[in-house]
Amino acid sequence: MSDQNLDIQQDHQKYVESLGDWARTNTCGELNANAIGSEVCLMGWVQFRRDHGGLIFIDLRDRSGLTQVVFSPDVSVDAHERAHVLRSEYVLAVRGTVRPRPEGMVNPNMKTGEVEVYVSEWKLLNTSKTPPFQVEDRVEASENLRLEYRYLDLRRPRLARNFQLRHRATQAIRNYLDQLNFLEVETPYLTKSTPEGARDFLVPSRMNQGEFYALPQSPQIFKQLLMVAGMDRYYQIVRCFRDEDLRADRQPEFTQVDIEMSFVDEERVQSMAEGLMARVFKETLGIDVALPFPRMPYDQAIAEYGLDKPDTRFDLRLKDVTDILRGSGFRLFAKAELVKAMRVPGGAVLSRKEIDDFTEFVKVYGAQGLAWIKIKEDEWQSPIAKFLSDDERAALTTELGLETGDIVFFQAASPDVVNNSLGYLRLKVADRFGLIPENSYNFLWVTDFPLFEYSPEDKRYVACHHPFTAPQVGHEELMVSDPAKARARAYDLVLNGNEVGGGSIRIHSREAQEHMFRALGFDPQEAEEQFGFLMQALELGAPPHGGIAFGMDRLVMLLAGSASIRDVIAFPKTQKATCLMTHAPDQVAAKQLRELGIRLREKQEA
C-alpha cells in the first residue's frame, strides 16, 4: 500500500459514523422490479465506484450479491458531494429509493439488474486500506496470498455462494435424518490414541503429565458404543483429524457426516444413504437423482476401471490381455505379472508430445513407461509393433474391438502399478478428449471389498477399512487361513470418480472382534489394552449395527463444481498443514511447556 493511499484512508477515518438506529431493510442481492418505489436501507462493501455524467455509481456488495446505488445531486447534494471519498472495500450504509434502470441499462447477469437505488443519505461505517488483491471472482492473486488474507478472499461472490450452498446441504442432511428419527449426539474430541489408522494428533495432558489425548480420526468406536447404549439411530456432523501427508484434496482437519444404525444390514444402510443424497441434491441444486444407485463389486471396479472409485460417466474400460501376450516377443509383456490395455477410440490423433506427457504422468503411479499402438489404415504404428505376431494382433483386435484411428495404451507390471497407472490415465485421457459430460452426477456403490490388504511397510495384513468391519458370512475362517481372499461387509459410495462416503456392517460380538485382532497380528494383551473397553461393551448385549460416513467437504466441493476442496472450507490449511493467516502451528511459551511437563530437545539432538 502506497504512503499516498494510506494517507487517504487515514484522512477518511474522520468521516466514519456509528450505525446508530439505522436498520437494514434488504440485502444487496434481493431487490427486483417488484421493489420499485420502495424506500430501502442497504449495507455492505463498496465493490466498484464509477463517476459518470455528474453521477456517482457504486456497486454495493454483501454475501447475497450486488446492488447498484446511485449518488445524484438531484436527489441529495450532500450525499453526492461526500460520495467522492468512497473507495473499494469501504463499509457503507445507504438509504434511498428503488428505481428502474434506464432503458438499455438493464443487466441480465445480475439478480438486481433491473433496478438501482438512488441514495438520499448514507453513512460511512468503516474505511479500508487498499486490499492486497481485488475482491472479485476473476482474481489474479496467488492462492498463498489469498489464504493469508482469507477473510478478504471469502468476500468473493463465488466463495460466498459456496458457503451458502454448504449451509443448505447441512440443513438438508439434518432435516432428512431428523425425519427418520435419528438423534444428533456429540462424541468426545479428547480421546484415546489407537493404532490401525493414520497418525493421530496428540494433545498433552497437564493434569496427567506424560500422558496424551488424541484428536479423533473418526468417532468410529464411540458411535458403536452408542448403538450398544440403545441410541438406535445416531448421526453427527463432526470434525475429524488426521496427521498424514496431504494431497491436494486432503486437509488435516475435515468434516464428516457420521451415521450409525442398529438392527440393519447393508441394504438398509444404503437405502437410507441414497435417500439422503437425493434430498441434498434436490434442495441444493434442484436435481432429481435416480434411485436406487447401481452396485459394482470391488473386483469388477479394479478389473475394468483400475480404481476402487470408478468414474462411470464415460465408457473407457481396461482389458486384461496377459494371456494373449504371454508368449510375446516383447519381453516386458511376456514376463509381466499383469498386462492390461485401454483402447481410446479416435485416439490416433494424439501427438508424440502428448503421448510423452502421458508417459511421464503414469510414472507418478510407479510405472516405468507407457507402451502404445496407433491403429492406422495400413499399419500398426508403434515402437513395439514389430514384436507382435499376426496371431497376437488378431487376438488384440478381437478382444479390444480395435478400429482404424484408435490408439491402445498398455501397462505391464505388478497389479497395483498396472491398475493405478492405467486407472488414472483413463481419467486424464477422458479429459483430453472431452468424454466427461458436464453437469452429470453418476452415483455408484462399490461393494464386496477385501477385508484385508497387505502392507509392504508393516510386512503384514492390515484392515482395508478398519478393524471393526464384519467379514462376509462364511469368510470368518479365511481371515486366518487365506486373508487375501476374505471379503468385508463394506461399501463405498462413489460420485463421479470421487469417494464421498464409506461404511460397513460392524462386528458386534467379543469373540468375533478378538478373532479379527488375531487375524491382524495383535497380541491379546495389546488388544485388551487398546480396545478392552469396546470388547467389554460387546459382551453386554450389543445389537447388530452398521453405518456410513460421508466426507462433507468433498461432497460440497462436487455440489459447487469447484476444483479444490479448499474452496468449500472457511479457513483451510496448506499442503504443509499450515495456516498462512494465523501462522499456525507456532512455538509456544516455555511456561506452557513446563506446565505440561514437556521439554523440547535441540534439533541436533533429535
Curated annotation (Swiss-Prot):
<comment type="subunit">
    <text>Homodimer.</text>
</comment>
<keyword id="KW-0030">Aminoacyl-tRNA synthetase</keyword>
<comment type="similarity">
    <text>Belongs to the class-II aminoacyl-tRNA synthetase family. Type 1 subfamily.</text>
</comment>
<dbReference type="InterPro" id="IPR002312">
    <property type="entry name" value="Asp/Asn-tRNA-synth_IIb"/>
</dbReference>
<dbReference type="GO" id="GO:0005737">
    <property type="term" value="C:cytoplasm"/>
</dbReference>
<protein>
    <recommendedName>
        <fullName>Aspartate--tRNA(Asp/Asn) ligase</fullName>
        <ecNumber>6.1.1.23</ecNumber>
    </recommendedName>
</protein>
<dbReference type="InterPro" id="IPR047090">
    <property type="entry name" value="AspRS_core"/>
</dbReference>
<dbReference type="InterPro" id="IPR004365">
    <property type="entry name" value="NA-bd_OB_tRNA"/>
</dbReference>
<keyword id="KW-0436">Ligase</keyword>
<dbReference type="InterPro" id="IPR004115">
    <property type="entry name" value="GAD-like_sf"/>
</dbReference>
<dbReference type="InterPro" id="IPR047089">
    <property type="entry name" value="Asp-tRNA-ligase_1_N"/>
</dbReference>
<feature type="binding site">
    <location>
        <position position="251"/>
    </location>
    <ligand>
        <name>ATP</name>
    </ligand>
</feature>
<feature type="site" description="Important for tRNA non-discrimination">
    <location>
        <position position="104"/>
    </location>
</feature>
<dbReference type="InterPro" id="IPR029351">
    <property type="entry name" value="GAD_dom"/>
</dbReference>
<feature type="binding site">
    <location>
        <position position="499"/>
    </location>
    <ligand>
        <name>ATP</name>
    </ligand>
</feature>
<dbReference type="InterPro" id="IPR006195">
    <property type="entry name" value="aa-tRNA-synth_II"/>
</dbReference>
<dbReference type="GO" id="GO:0050560">
    <property type="term" value="F:aspartate-tRNA(Asn) ligase activity"/>
</dbReference>
<keyword id="KW-0547">Nucleotide-binding</keyword>
<comment type="function">
    <text>Aspartyl-tRNA synthetase with relaxed tRNA specificity since it is able to aspartylate not only its cognate tRNA(Asp) but also tRNA(Asn). Reaction proceeds in two steps: L-aspartate is first activated by ATP to form Asp-AMP and then transferred to the acceptor end of tRNA(Asp/Asn).</text>
</comment>
<dbReference type="Pfam" id="PF02938">
    <property type="entry name" value="GAD"/>
</dbReference>
<feature type="site" description="Important for tRNA non-discrimination">
    <location>
        <position position="52"/>
    </location>
</feature>
<dbReference type="GO" id="GO:0004815">
    <property type="term" value="F:aspartate-tRNA ligase activity"/>
</dbReference>
<feature type="binding site">
    <location>
        <position position="196"/>
    </location>
    <ligand>
        <name>L-aspartate</name>
    </ligand>
</feature>
<dbReference type="Pfam" id="PF01336">
    <property type="entry name" value="tRNA_anti-codon"/>
</dbReference>
<dbReference type="InterPro" id="IPR004524">
    <property type="entry name" value="Asp-tRNA-ligase_1"/>
</dbReference>
<dbReference type="InterPro" id="IPR045864">
    <property type="entry name" value="aa-tRNA-synth_II/BPL/LPL"/>
</dbReference>
<dbReference type="GO" id="GO:0006422">
    <property type="term" value="P:aspartyl-tRNA aminoacylation"/>
</dbReference>
<feature type="binding site">
    <location>
        <position position="465"/>
    </location>
    <ligand>
        <name>L-aspartate</name>
    </ligand>
</feature>
<dbReference type="Pfam" id="PF00152">
    <property type="entry name" value="tRNA-synt_2"/>
</dbReference>
<dbReference type="GO" id="GO:0003676">
    <property type="term" value="F:nucleic acid binding"/>
</dbReference>
<feature type="binding site">
    <location>
        <begin position="551"/>
        <end position="554"/>
    </location>
    <ligand>
        <name>ATP</name>
    </ligand>
</feature>
<dbReference type="GO" id="GO:0005524">
    <property type="term" value="F:ATP binding"/>
</dbReference>
<keyword id="KW-0963">Cytoplasm</keyword>
<feature type="binding site">
    <location>
        <position position="506"/>
    </location>
    <ligand>
        <name>L-aspartate</name>
    </ligand>
</feature>
<dbReference type="InterPro" id="IPR012340">
    <property type="entry name" value="NA-bd_OB-fold"/>
</dbReference>
<feature type="binding site">
    <location>
        <position position="242"/>
    </location>
    <ligand>
        <name>L-aspartate</name>
    </ligand>
</feature>
<keyword id="KW-0648">Protein biosynthesis</keyword>
<feature type="binding site">
    <location>
        <begin position="242"/>
        <end position="244"/>
    </location>
    <ligand>
        <name>ATP</name>
    </ligand>
</feature>
<keyword id="KW-0067">ATP-binding</keyword>
<dbReference type="InterPro" id="IPR004364">
    <property type="entry name" value="Aa-tRNA-synt_II"/>
</dbReference>
<feature type="region of interest" description="Aspartate">
    <location>
        <begin position="220"/>
        <end position="223"/>
    </location>
</feature>
